[in-house]
């Protein structure tokens, strides 16, 4: 009998998101005869947590969560917090680390200051994957605190558009054995920025089970408002990089041309209040519907008339791939991976990121 390989994936949580969904899909494809699967979560929580296969071993990574505030808030906030609590020596030490970071233009030393002394994962693995990458704390932890024969970084987005610590990423990924990138375009961009790492990179598309998506569409909720016009749908976290505000402006332009439309947004996030206020200020309260976060949005995807992905940047967009499982026309902005995903799609179009260009793309499927 062949010995199973122990493989470990590290990410932050299982809250609803593209990275988390892609992990669930990936784990469903791994052979249980070949792999003994382990998942580390900084916070073992989230609506997608029950979707992890029952044979997966879960590891809460308190090494990172105990320093969460220090790692994620601005360093000066941490230093001021130390001063307010009377920890003057710690504040001085942290301040000198902060100065080193500013001079070196990298926050590697800041993360190292907190994570260098943690114990790490006790077990040894054949493969360890920093799945939520590039993320400085995740990449650091897998690099130095997880014992494994092979270490893999996983890049889920366009690193030219997302604010990563390039110096730290170069250092850490230089110590990895392989770097998987979720789209051809994403790999090309990564290789241009990190020429010395290009021999380590390989495209690994996010996995989508078309049959599973269709099955879930049959049992999930869908539109229930008896609207008779055209329904446009966007699924994704309500945040600046996902482009919902531009989509609302595009809807305004389309309604001015007398199209009978209603735009539905599935998701939740930091921009929800701003988007609702924008819809109200533009007089679109009856034409914009916020449906909230849905673990299973596939009934909406199946029954919408047009699906729009207005993102500012992506890597390989999971929600776009899921929408393509159905027959509705798809409009996507020109983020990394969009053209890769929509190639050979008769009912798909890639447009620019302005409201005018998105509106024009939608209009192609209204006339």
Over which residues does each language-model region extend?
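A conserved mid-protein helix/loop that constitutes part of the nucleotide-sugar donor-binding site
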Residues: 20-25, 230-253, 259, 270-276
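Short alpha-helical segment that forms part of, or immediately flanks, the ligand-binding pocket
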Residues: 298, 316-325, 339-340
